[in-house]
Amino acid sequence: MLCRRFLPPSASRHIAALVCGAGVSWPDVRLAPRRVLVGSSISIALVPHLGEGDQAVLFATRFGEEPEVVNWLETAAPHHYDIVLEIGANNGFFSVFLDALIRSMPSAKLRSVVSFEPSLEAFQRLLANLAANDAVHVSPFRAAVGTAAGFQAFFMPRGHLANGSLLRSFAAQCADEIDEQTVAVIDAASLEYFFTGIDRALLKIDAEGYEPQILQSLDPLIERHRPDIVIEVLAATAQAIEDFAARAGYRRFLLTPAGPQTRERVSADRDFRDWLLCAARTGEV
């Protein structure tokens, strides 16, 4: 509590490194949710886990996860979109943030968030974070989105909860030991349900190397509904995502702390991974 309320950020980070840094091992301890500020000052609660990214909420009252994405979502999502579909929601950080945004803006256009996460452990954390926030605008589903509906192997690099993937080759880059789960997979046809009566939708895709396959699966849906897309771009996926953007006629913007930056092509960036792909239409980004 001292770290969170009274110490400067540099001192809090130093204490966090001493308590939870590399080489420090803790037993699995259930901790209570901590309330933190994100974006301009949106308050959310997150359940911390020692040794993982969300442990930061133990040591500070502000949580700085992917600020370039948070800032853009806070500015654009409530006013431009009816629904956000989050594919690869992990522990639900963005889902609870979007829910808090909706509740803070009763007149917002955005009214619904749909979250997909295949990993059992990550999905349990997503549910815990939704409960900690009394979230009412989020519909969570334990499922992956892929090229065909059915069941598929999902690969979890041990000790790297955020890097689970439908691609074993991707998971193997993160850890030597890989745990395998069988998960439900839905395809684009299943997502049509969420577009009924929708004027404008946003897809947020973070699938640890599987993004090109998801875009391929969603191609007919994207052609019909023209959603905007926030997507993680890595060196191995950049060309396939650029090919999609060119074929679909989408504008490309790299999300940065200074806002979306127009780019001619999608490419892997040294500092920022998330891109905004916008359907050709008039209006603000």
Describe each region flagged by the PLM.
Residues 1-119, 124-197, ...:
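S-adenosyl-L-methionine
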Residues 60-85, 153, 167-225, 236-240, ...:
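Short internal loop-to-helix segment that lines adenine-nucleotide cofactor pockets
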Residues 120, 209-210, 234-237, 258-259:
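Short beta->alpha connector loops
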Residues 141-143, 250-259:
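Conserved S-adenosyl-L-methionine
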Residues 152-159, 265-273:
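Short, surface-exposed amphipathic charged segments that create phosphate/polyanion-binding patches used
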Residues 114-117, 227-233:
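Short internal beta-strands
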Residues 89, 118, 145-147, 188, ...:
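Hydrophobic pocket-lining residues within nucleotide cofactor-binding pockets
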